[in-house]
Protein backbone atom coordinates (compact mmCIF):
# COMPACT_ATOMS: atom_id res chain seq x y z
CA UNK A 1 0.00 0.00 0.00
CA UNK A 2 2.95 2.33 0.58
CA UNK A 3 3.84 2.01 -3.10
CA UNK A 4 0.35 3.10 -4.14
CA UNK A 5 0.47 6.05 -1.74
CA UNK A 6 3.86 7.14 -3.11
CA UNK A 7 2.64 6.82 -6.69
CA UNK A 8 -0.52 8.78 -5.85
CA UNK A 9 1.54 11.53 -4.24
CA UNK A 10 3.73 11.76 -7.32
CA UNK A 11 0.67 11.83 -9.56
CA UNK A 12 -0.85 14.76 -7.65
CA UNK A 13 2.26 16.59 -6.48
CA UNK A 14 2.87 18.65 -3.37
CA UNK A 15 2.09 21.90 -5.19
CA UNK A 16 -1.47 20.82 -5.97
CA UNK A 17 -2.13 19.68 -2.39
CA UNK A 18 -0.71 22.97 -1.05
CA UNK A 19 -2.87 25.01 -3.43
CA UNK A 20 -5.98 23.00 -2.39
CA UNK A 21 -5.19 23.64 1.28
CA UNK A 22 -4.60 27.38 0.85
CA UNK A 23 -7.77 27.77 -1.22
CA UNK A 24 -9.73 25.84 1.41
CA UNK A 25 -8.46 28.02 4.27
CA UNK A 26 -9.06 31.27 2.37
CA UNK A 27 -12.60 30.26 1.38
CA UNK A 28 -13.51 29.05 4.88
CA UNK A 29 -12.17 32.25 6.45
CA UNK A 30 -14.06 34.54 4.04
CA UNK A 31 -17.37 32.70 4.48
CA UNK A 32 -16.94 32.63 8.27
CA UNK A 33 -16.13 36.35 8.45
CA UNK A 34 -19.22 37.23 6.40
CA UNK A 35 -21.53 35.08 8.54
CA UNK A 36 -20.12 36.32 11.83
CA UNK A 37 -20.35 39.97 10.85
CA UNK A 38 -24.12 39.54 10.58
CA UNK A 39 -24.39 37.52 13.80
CA UNK A 40 -22.33 40.08 15.70
CA UNK A 41 -24.56 42.95 14.51
CA UNK A 42 -27.66 41.06 15.65
CA UNK A 43 -25.93 40.07 18.93
CA UNK A 44 -26.67 36.39 18.35
CA UNK A 45 -23.20 34.97 19.01
CA UNK A 46 -24.17 33.63 22.44
CA UNK A 47 -27.02 31.59 20.90
CA UNK A 48 -24.44 29.47 19.05
CA UNK A 49 -22.44 28.69 22.19
CA UNK A 50 -23.12 26.55 25.27
CA UNK A 51 -24.96 28.25 28.13
CA UNK A 52 -21.72 28.41 30.15
CA UNK A 53 -20.26 30.80 27.57
CA UNK A 54 -23.10 33.32 27.87
CA UNK A 55 -21.23 35.33 30.53
CA UNK A 56 -18.00 35.58 28.53
CA UNK A 57 -16.99 38.92 26.97
CA UNK A 58 -18.18 39.57 23.41
CA UNK A 59 -14.69 39.34 21.89
CA UNK A 60 -14.16 35.88 23.39
CA UNK A 61 -17.58 34.74 22.17
CA UNK A 62 -16.65 36.01 18.72
CA UNK A 63 -13.40 34.03 18.78
CA UNK A 64 -15.12 30.81 19.85
CA UNK A 65 -17.88 31.08 17.24
CA UNK A 66 -15.34 32.01 14.56
CA UNK A 67 -13.29 28.93 15.44
CA UNK A 68 -16.35 26.65 15.38
CA UNK A 69 -17.52 27.90 11.98
CA UNK A 70 -14.01 27.98 10.53
CA UNK A 71 -13.44 24.33 11.43
CA UNK A 72 -16.92 23.43 10.20
CA UNK A 73 -16.22 24.89 6.75
CA UNK A 74 -12.74 23.35 6.70
CA UNK A 75 -14.32 19.94 7.27
CA UNK A 76 -16.90 20.56 4.55
CA UNK A 77 -14.18 21.64 2.16
CA UNK A 78 -12.16 18.55 3.02
CA UNK A 79 -15.13 16.35 2.07
CA UNK A 80 -15.18 18.06 -1.32
CA UNK A 81 -11.42 17.66 -1.69
CA UNK A 82 -11.81 13.95 -0.95
CA UNK A 83 -14.33 13.78 -3.78
CA UNK A 84 -11.94 15.52 -6.19
CA UNK A 85 -9.05 13.29 -5.08
CA UNK A 86 -11.20 10.21 -5.58
CA UNK A 87 -12.04 11.30 -9.10
CA UNK A 88 -8.48 12.30 -9.91
CA UNK A 89 -6.85 9.15 -8.53
CA UNK A 90 -9.44 6.41 -9.03
CA UNK A 91 -11.39 7.48 -12.10
CA UNK A 92 -8.28 8.76 -13.84
CA UNK A 93 -6.54 5.49 -13.00
CA UNK A 94 -9.39 3.57 -14.67
CA UNK A 95 -9.43 5.72 -17.78
CA UNK A 96 -5.66 5.86 -18.29
CA UNK A 97 -5.17 2.21 -17.34
CA UNK A 98 -2.95 3.16 -14.40
CA UNK A 99 -4.63 0.43 -12.36
CA UNK A 100 -3.37 -2.11 -14.86
CA UNK A 101 0.14 -0.69 -14.43
CA UNK A 102 -0.10 -0.63 -10.63
CA UNK A 103 -1.43 -4.19 -10.61
CA UNK A 104 1.93 -5.33 -12.03
CA UNK A 105 3.49 -4.54 -8.65
CA UNK A 106 3.57 -7.38 -6.10
CA UNK A 107 0.21 -6.31 -4.70
CA UNK A 108 -3.08 -8.06 -4.20
CA UNK A 109 -6.31 -6.45 -5.40
CA UNK A 110 -7.22 -5.74 -1.77
CA UNK A 111 -3.90 -3.97 -1.14
CA UNK A 112 -4.35 -1.93 -4.31
CA UNK A 113 -7.89 -1.00 -3.28
CA UNK A 114 -7.03 0.09 0.26
CA UNK A 115 -3.82 1.73 -0.94
CA UNK A 116 -5.89 4.15 -3.03
CA UNK A 117 -8.19 4.90 -0.10
CA UNK A 118 -5.22 5.38 2.24
CA UNK A 119 -3.70 7.83 -0.24
CA UNK A 120 -6.96 9.81 -0.38
CA UNK A 121 -7.22 9.93 3.43
CA UNK A 122 -3.59 10.96 3.82
CA UNK A 123 -3.61 13.62 1.11
CA UNK A 124 -6.87 15.13 2.40
CA UNK A 125 -6.31 14.57 6.10
CA UNK A 126 -2.77 15.75 6.75
CA UNK A 127 -3.37 19.36 5.60
CA UNK A 128 -6.63 19.45 7.61
CA UNK A 129 -4.97 18.20 10.80
CA UNK A 130 -2.07 20.66 10.43
CA UNK A 131 -4.40 23.60 9.72
CA UNK A 132 -6.75 22.52 12.50
CA UNK A 133 -3.94 22.23 15.05
CA UNK A 134 -2.55 25.66 14.14
CA UNK A 135 -5.99 27.28 14.30
CA UNK A 136 -6.80 25.65 17.62
CA UNK A 137 -3.37 26.53 19.01
CA UNK A 138 -3.79 30.18 18.08
CA UNK A 139 -7.30 30.24 19.56
CA UNK A 140 -6.15 28.66 22.83
CA UNK A 141 -3.28 31.16 23.08
CA UNK A 142 -5.62 34.07 22.33
CA UNK A 143 -8.15 32.90 24.92
CA UNK A 144 -5.48 32.50 27.59
CA UNK A 145 -4.57 36.15 27.00
CA UNK A 146 -8.16 37.34 27.39
CA UNK A 147 -9.64 34.82 29.80
CA UNK A 148 -8.49 32.35 32.42
CA UNK A 149 -9.10 29.48 32.30
CA UNK A 150 -9.48 29.11 28.52
CA UNK A 151 -12.77 27.49 27.43
CA UNK A 152 -10.87 25.29 24.95
CA UNK A 153 -7.84 23.24 25.99
CA UNK A 154 -5.94 20.10 25.01
CA UNK A 155 -8.95 17.90 25.71
CA UNK A 156 -11.11 20.04 23.45
CA UNK A 157 -8.52 19.91 20.67
CA UNK A 158 -8.25 16.12 20.97
CA UNK A 159 -12.02 15.79 20.65
CA UNK A 160 -12.04 18.07 17.60
CA UNK A 161 -9.28 16.03 15.95
CA UNK A 162 -11.17 12.81 16.68
CA UNK A 163 -14.25 14.33 15.04
CA UNK A 164 -12.10 15.33 12.07
CA UNK A 165 -10.96 11.73 11.73
CA UNK A 166 -14.57 10.56 11.57
CA UNK A 167 -15.37 13.25 8.99
CA UNK A 168 -12.48 11.99 6.84
CA UNK A 169 -13.67 8.38 7.09
CA UNK A 170 -17.25 9.35 6.28
CA UNK A 171 -15.90 11.34 3.33
CA UNK A 172 -14.80 8.05 1.79
CA UNK A 173 -18.46 7.49 0.92
CA UNK A 174 -18.03 9.78 -2.08
CA UNK A 175 -14.74 8.06 -2.92
CA UNK A 176 -16.42 4.66 -2.95
CA UNK A 177 -18.72 5.85 -5.73
CA UNK A 178 -15.66 6.30 -7.94
CA UNK A 179 -15.33 2.52 -8.01
CA UNK A 180 -18.97 2.10 -9.06
CA UNK A 181 -19.58 5.12 -11.31
CA UNK A 182 -16.57 6.51 -13.15
CA UNK A 183 -17.99 10.03 -13.48
CA UNK A 184 -17.15 13.25 -11.69
CA UNK A 185 -20.80 14.26 -11.23
CA UNK A 186 -21.66 11.24 -9.07
CA UNK A 187 -18.62 11.70 -6.86
CA UNK A 188 -18.99 15.46 -6.32
CA UNK A 189 -22.78 15.37 -5.81
CA UNK A 190 -22.35 12.72 -3.11
CA UNK A 191 -19.66 14.87 -1.45
CA UNK A 192 -21.98 17.90 -1.53
CA UNK A 193 -24.79 15.88 0.06
CA UNK A 194 -22.41 14.80 2.81
CA UNK A 195 -21.46 18.45 3.35
CA UNK A 196 -25.10 19.49 3.70
CA UNK A 197 -25.96 16.65 6.09
CA UNK A 198 -22.92 17.02 8.33
CA UNK A 199 -22.91 20.83 8.37
CA UNK A 200 -26.57 20.93 9.37
CA UNK A 201 -25.96 18.29 12.03
CA UNK A 202 -22.99 20.25 13.39
CA UNK A 203 -24.83 23.58 13.61
CA UNK A 204 -27.94 21.94 15.09
CA UNK A 205 -26.05 20.02 17.77
CA UNK A 206 -24.14 23.14 18.83
CA UNK A 207 -27.46 24.61 19.88
CA UNK A 208 -29.08 21.49 21.32
CA UNK A 209 -26.99 18.49 22.32
CA UNK A 210 -23.56 17.45 21.01
CA UNK A 211 -24.50 13.77 20.99
CA UNK A 212 -26.58 14.26 17.84
CA UNK A 213 -23.50 14.86 15.69
CA UNK A 214 -21.92 11.63 16.90
CA UNK A 215 -25.11 9.75 16.04
CA UNK A 216 -25.13 11.15 12.49
CA UNK A 217 -21.43 10.40 12.06
CA UNK A 218 -21.90 6.85 13.36
CA UNK A 219 -24.77 6.12 10.95
CA UNK A 220 -22.89 7.57 7.97
CA UNK A 221 -19.74 5.70 8.98
CA UNK A 222 -21.68 2.42 9.07
CA UNK A 223 -23.08 3.13 5.59
CA UNK A 224 -19.58 4.00 4.37
CA UNK A 225 -18.08 0.76 5.71
CA UNK A 226 -20.84 -1.28 4.06
CA UNK A 227 -20.21 0.53 0.77
CA UNK A 228 -16.46 -0.07 1.11
CA UNK A 229 -17.05 -3.79 1.60
CA UNK A 230 -19.41 -3.90 -1.40
CA UNK A 231 -17.13 -1.94 -3.71
CA UNK A 232 -14.13 -4.07 -2.68
CA UNK A 233 -16.03 -7.19 -3.70
CA UNK A 234 -16.96 -5.48 -6.98
CA UNK A 235 -13.38 -4.29 -7.58
CA UNK A 236 -11.81 -7.72 -7.10
CA UNK A 237 -13.98 -9.06 -9.92
CA UNK A 238 -13.14 -6.28 -12.39
CA UNK A 239 -10.90 -6.83 -15.39
CA UNK A 240 -8.11 -4.26 -15.13
State what each model feature region is.
Residues 1-81, 85, 93, 179-180, ...:
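Hydrophobic alpha-helical transmembrane segments
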Residues 5, 9, 112-113, 157:
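Hydrophobic alpha-helical elements at and bordering transmembrane segments
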Residues 17, 108-114, 182-188:
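Membrane-helix interface segments
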Residues 22, 116-117, 160, 164, ...:
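Residue-level recognition of transmembrane alpha-helices
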Residues 27-89, 114-185:
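Secretory targeting signals
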Residues 88-121:
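Helix-loop-helix units of permease transmembrane domains in multi-pass membrane transporters
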Residues 154-159, 203-215:
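Membrane-water interface segments at transmembrane-helix boundaries in multipass membrane proteins
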Amino acid sequence: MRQIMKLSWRQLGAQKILSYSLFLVATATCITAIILSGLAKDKRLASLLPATAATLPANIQYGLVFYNFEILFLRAGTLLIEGFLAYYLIVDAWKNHNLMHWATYPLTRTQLYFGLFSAILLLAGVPLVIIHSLAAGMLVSWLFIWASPAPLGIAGLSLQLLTDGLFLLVGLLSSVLAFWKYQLSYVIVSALLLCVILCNASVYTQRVHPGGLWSVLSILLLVTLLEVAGSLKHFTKQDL
